[in-house]
From Swiss-Prot:
GO cellular component terms attached to this protein's record: cytosol; Golgi membrane
The organism of origin for this protein: Eremothecium gossypii (strain ATCC 10895 / CBS 109.51 / FGSC 9923 / NRRL Y-1056) (Yeast)
SMART domains: Grip
Gene: IMH1
Protein name stated in the entry: Golgin IMH1
Compositionally biased tracts (Polar residues): 240-254, 808-822
Length: 887
């Protein structure tokens, strides 16, 4: 605008010079032509008249000839002067120039305009830089949103995995319950078998006692029969002559003896208990026979009785052998009964332990259920988040739905495969049970029961080992939970500390807003005082006395400002007293005190400038009466410019406050999201640790199952050597066991792979947590920097708003200052030099205080480092060097 006006003025001056030159040239040509024409005519109508009159008439003719030219020149000059006046009006309305000779004022005005344009360009550059920074922050926020979406997808996958593992845990629990029921049934069977064994043992003991008594009686009878045999041999030798008579008698008594033998044999076939009675009868008969022998003293009877006793003796020897075998068997049964009792007792103790462990496992399953509930709640939360994300983009939701469907299909397929595997295992179990039953039928009941009890003991021992390992892992998990809780508490403390810092920053912002409102009120007050000054300028002659009153009012205002200074000094003293109690707020209070000191210095500068202006006004009253008209125009222009500048500044402040509020809201949202993400990641990390431990426990269980299967295989091989008949069935069972071993080894490998994947996921989550922590630190530093920059921009805007009217006043008052510069040049220059020195001293004091605080307070170095870097214009490399040198 101003450049165009200056160019327009130059063009007008050039055109004026050209027009004057052309007019003079045309007049010269006109006069020469007229004279030549008159000379050519030779004779004129005035020759008859006297020469004096002719000369006068010729002069009149010349005047008449020149009159239109002069008239045209006058008109042109008048038009040019009107144009110059219009130009002067425009310049006087838009610039502090009041006359054509005010070249220096025009130069000063254009220089001020150039400075203002430079300041505007700098502000535009600053705003563009801030805009670029905000765009970068928006890009980073978009990237963080994309990363969150990726994290959501990964979290959904992890939740799907957790649901699968939950189903597997449920199936394992069902298997454990089934195994428990089987163990209980086996215990009951073992108890029943033990009871049967006890009854058999008691029966065998009773039978053994009876057999002992019978053996003793038979031994006595044997001794007697041996004695009888010796006597019978002697009698047979004596009675060799009387055989004929002896043959007739035994033939008559043989049927009775045979009848007795038949009765004895029948008694043996019926019951073993009656055998003792018959033996007692035979012993009684023998005694009767012995009593008869001396009475009858017949040789035939003795021979018959000897033969009968031989037969009885042989029978008794056979029965003795059978009874000795039965005694050995009964002793073997007694030992087996004792072993079975001991095993039953051990089984009962192991059953008690297994029950306790099952209770613990049930409790663990309940905890797993609780974790599954939490996982379900997290799934619900994730679904809610997905619903929220549905508003943002339907494509992503469809993709997530497709992925969920795929995961569900995969889950269903895996469940189907697991069910098939369970069915296969159940079939294998049934086949093994049938094989075991066949082996039980083939082998003796007691041996099968003992083998069962041994297998159960091994199983219970393995389960005991597994449960002890689980307890150890549970203790380790408790320790890890305690450590994680400690870390969580520490992180919560850091979050609370950051929230307190945010609150402090909010309070500072409120105070800054209050200060901004105070500055606005001060601006309005200064505007009112400016209006009053304008009114006083219009009535300067009549209001000299009022001017003195204004002096007094300014003195009163100075007193008020001094009172305010005292109040602020008291506040500063109170803040210094509070410094010992609140070390964290020292930097903020210092900044506030420095701002207040700067405000006080600005106020003192204003007071000094006002006093100088009043002194100048007292000397320049007469000149201002002449320049009142021009000053009115200048004041109107200043008003309009001030209003426009104030509006622009208010718009800038509003835009900056809006941007700051937006940034603050975005940062708060980002911080909340990041805190939520960190908590979610911690929870997922804990869940993954629990899952890893569960998988390790599964690996251990599978290893124990493999060992059990190997033990079973070895036992089956041992039994195969003893039981040759069931070798084919044992081979089938061995094959099945080998297949189950292969499947279990495959499961072990799969579990190891899944364990490694979970470990890698855990490492990735830890890396993500570190990245989030670094981002959190970067965002906090950016927030501090943005707040510091906003406070600095406010301070600069305030100083600009306060300096702009003074600069306008200086430009407006430039004509009168030029007129006075000859009278008072030295004080003005000295005041400007003093103000510059004061500002430089203030800046140096501020930098000194910041550096001293940075060096003294180690805890606040992280907060003061961005301020020091902005003051000293340090790069990141310089900051690192500074920190390393301080360490």
């Amino acid at each position: 605008m101003f450049k165009q006006l200056s160019q327009f003025g130059k063009n007008i001056t050039d055109e004026l010079a050209k027009g004057i030159n052309e007019d003079t040239a045309s007049e010269g040509q006109h006069g020469a032509g007229a004279q030549g024409g008159r000379r050519e005519e030779g004779g004129s109508p005035y020759e008859e008249l006297p020469k004096e009159i002719q000369a006068k008439l010729r002069k009149f003719e010349k005047y008449e000839q020149k009159y239109p030219l002069l008239l045209n020149a006058y008109k042109a000059e008048k038009e040019k002067s009107d144009e110059v006046e219009l130009l002067l009006k425009v310049l006087s309305e838009n610039t502090p120039v009041s006359a054509i000779g005010d070249v220096e004022t025009l130069r000063g005005f254009f220089e001020d305009v150039g400075v203002k344009t430079a300041m505007l360009t700098e502000e535009i550059k600053r705003i563009t830089g801030e805009n670029n920074g905000l765009q970068k922050q928006l890009a980073e926020a978009q990237e963080s949103l994309e990363q969150r979406q990726r994290d959501l997808t990964s979290r959904e996958e992890e939740l799907a995995k957790s649901s699968r593992e939950a189903t597997e845990l449920r199936e394992l629990r069902q298997q454990a319950v089934a195994e428990k029921d089987a163990a209980v049934t086996e215990r009951d069977d073992a108890q029943k078998a033990a009871a049967e064994m006890e009854t058999r043992c008691t029966e065998a003991e009773a039978h053994a006692a009876e057999m002992k008594s019978q053996i003793e009686s038979m031994e006595t009878e044997l001794k007697r029969t041996e004695k009888l045999l010796t006597t019978y041999k002697s009698t047979i030798q004596e009675l060799g002559a009387s055989q004929a008579t002896g043959e007739a008698q035994p033939s008559s008594e043989a049927p009775s003896v045979r009848g007795k033998k038949g009765k004895g044999k029948r008694g043996k076939g019926k019951k073993r208990v009656q055998a003792a009675d018959e033996k007692a009868d035979t012993s009684s008969e023998l005694e009767l026979g012995e009593e008869k022998t001396p009475s009858t003293s017949s040789a035939g009877d003795e021979i018959i009785e000897a033969i009968e006793t031989k037969q009885k003796y042989e029978n008794l020897v056979e029965e003795h052998q059978q009874l000795s075998l039965e005694l050995e068997k009964s002793r073997h049964w007694e030992q087996e009964c004792l072993d079975s009792r001991k095993k039953v007792e051990t089984l009962e103790t192991e059953l008690k332990d297994v029950k306790a462990k099952l209770k613990n496992s049930n409790e663990e399953l309940e905890t797993v259920r609780g974790m599954l509930k939490t996982v379900g709640n997290e799934l619900v939360h994730a679904r809610d988040e997905l619903k929220q994300l549905n508003c943002e983009g339907t494509n992503e939701v469809e993709r997530l739905k497709s992925e969920l469907q795929e995961l569900r299909t995969e889950n269903s397929t895996q469940i189907a495969t697991l069910k098939e595997q369970l069915q296969l295992l159940n079939d294998q179990k049934k086949a093994l049970e049938t094989d075991v039953e066949q082996h039980k039928r083939k082998m003796e009941d007691l041996e099968s029961e003992l083998l069962k009890s041994q297998e159960n003991v091994s199983k219970f021992r393995n389960q005991n080992n597994d449960l002890s390992e689980k307890l150890r892992d549970y203790i380790v998990l408790k320790k890890s939970e305690a450590t994680t809780r400690m870390s969580l508490s520490q992180k919560e403390k850091t979050i609370e500390y950051l929230e307190e810092q945010v609150r402090q920053y909010n309070s500072k912002e409120i105070e800054d807003k209050k200060a901004f409102a105070d500055s606005k009120t001060e601006l309005e007050r200064w505007q009112r005082t400016a209006a009053n000054l304008e009114k006083q300028l219009e009535r300067i002659r009549l209001e000299t006395k009022r001017h003195d009153d204004n002096l007094e009012s300014y003195i009163k205002e100075n007193g008020k400002l001094s009172e305010r200074l005292e109040v602020l000094q008291e506040k500063y003293d109170s803040l210094q007293n509070l410094k010992s109690n609140s070390g964290d707020q020292v930097s903020a209070i210092r900044k506030q005190c420095e701002e207040l000191n700067s405000k006080l210095k600005e106020a003192t500068k204003r007071v000094m400038s006002l006093e100088d202006e009043l002194n100048e006004t007292s000397t320049v009253l007469q000149e201002r009466t002449r320049e009142a008209t021009t000053m009115r125009r200048m004041i109107n222009s200043d008003r309009s410019s001030k209003d426009t500048k104030i509006r622009e500044l208010e718009d800038r402040v509003a835009a900056a406050s809006e941007e700051r509020d937006k940034l603050k809201s975005e940062l708060d949202v980002l911080l909340a999201r990041k805190n939520h993400e960190t908590q979610d990641l911690k929870n997922t990390n804990q869940e993954l640790v629990v899952k890893i431990n569960a998988l390790e426990l599964k690996e251990q269980e599978l290893a124990t199952e493999v060992q059990q299967l190997k033990v079973l295989n070895q036992t089956i091989r041992r039994h195969s050597s003893t039981a040759a008949d069931g070798s084919e069935e044992l081979e089938l069972t061995v094959r099945k066991l080998k297949d189950s071993l292969r499947t279990s080894e495959k499961k072990m490998r799969e579990l190891k792979d899944s364990n490694e994947e979970l470990k890698s996921l855990n490492d990735e989550l830890n890396a993500k947590l570190d990245r989030l922590a670094n981002r959190y630190k970067v965002l906090s530093t950016q927030l501090k920097m943005s707040k510091d920059m906003s406070s600095q921009s406010r301070h600069s805007s305030r100083s600009g708003s306060l300096v702009s009217p003074s600069s306008d006043n200086e430009t407006g008052n430039s004509p009168r200052k030029i007129s006075i510069s000859s009278a008072h040049p030295a004080p003005v220059v000295a005041s400007y030099d003093n103000s510059a020195e004061m500002e430089s001293n203030e800046k140096l004091a501020y930098i000194r205080n910041v550096l001293l605080g940075f060096l003294e307070h180690r805890e606040q170095r992280s907060q003061l480092l961005p301020v020091v870097s902005t003051l000293l214009q340090l790069s990141s490399h310089d900051e690192k060097r500074l920190l390393t040198s301080l360490k």
